[in-house]
């Protein structure tokens, strides 16, 4: 009798156990931990499954709960907002840095341009005893200014080469110590040849420089300054080049020569037309 009662009791307990467990698993996603305690006869103190509230401050929430509340916790939402904020800040910072970089580049370019303007051009100055201020040198010039010179009654005239994209300038003034001397200073380098209409005249008068030992001085200067020494005036109007200074940067070199020495040879023209000079000598 007792065995039968005990068997029925165990059977009913198994049915209740199965029914209660299946009901608990199929009831909802959030388990009823209190019913599990009744089925497995856990005490409230020893049960690892305790009813918890979806609070952010609960340390067991991320470990025991599978509810959507945990998956959308504030710990996952904040980095997105912070990431967006940081990305925005990064973009702003990059924009600021980019702007600063561009401005610094512009300043650097401006500084370079200013530095290039401050660089001194090559200058060649020579004195000529002449009654004419503006001496012919083979190039075309345009006068763009005139300025008074301190302690001198003679003004200084400024000229610019008329060829496009040529920045060569020259200034002409008379010496206040000796008004018969004209000081002509060239600045820069011509980026073009002598105009074709003046080549023949200048080449023919190249003899004036070669006479009197001037040939060695002519070849001691760069090619673009050799044309400056080819004058178009006759010896009756001036006494060739009395002195010449060559300035590059901070160094200046002076040369003196005389045009009244006896003729040694005919220079370049004798090489070109030797028959002409042989007839004259005969």
UniProtKB/Swiss-Prot annotation:
PROSITE patterns: WRKY
Record field: compositional bias (Low complexity): 65-75
Ranges annotated as biased composition (Basic and acidic residues): 77-99
Keyword Cytoplasm: no
Keywords assigned by UniProt, alphabetized: DNA-binding, Nucleus, Transcription, Transcription regulation
Segments of this protein annotated with the region Disordered: 63-121
Domain of life where this protein originates: Eukaryota
Disulfide bonds: none
Molecular function GO labels: DNA-binding transcription factor activity; sequence-specific double-stranded DNA binding
Biological processes annotated in GO: positive regulation of DNA-templated transcription; vegetative to reproductive phase transition of meristem
Residue ranges of DNA binding: 130-195
SUPFAM superfamilies: WRKY DNA-binding domain
GO cellular component: nucleus
Subcellular location: Nucleus
InterPro entries given in the database record: TF_WRKY_IIc, WRKY_dom, WRKY_dom_sf, WRKY_plant
Stated role: Transcription factor. Interacts specifically with the W box (5'-(T)TGAC[CT]-3'), a frequently occurring elicitor-responsive cis-acting element.
Family of this protein: Belongs to the WRKY group II-c family.
Protein name: WRKY transcription factor 71
Lineage, top ranks: Eukaryota, Viridiplantae, Streptophyta, Embryophyta, Tracheophyta
